[in-house]
């Protein structure tokens, strides 16, 4: 069973959030992601592994291609909600100043 801390730790990096957002649009090969993200290939692989280990993305083989897909679409709702909360907090902080 995945615990909530593992999931939130996986979401604690902007690159992993961007990966999830990209993969929520369509299934992608890891080689395609290398062209989309301006980070080192080994760093990208590490981020993918963290998301796979957290159960947030799935890897499937299609011939020689390793395809990645968001395993739970509701995680995108969690990301959107966290973004809304962040904006709310910023507004409240600005109002107090």
Segments and roles (model prediction):
Residues 2-3, 24, 74-97:
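Amphipathic alpha-helical dimerization/coiled-coil segments
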Residues 35, 52-53:
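Alpha-helical residues within the helix-turn-helix
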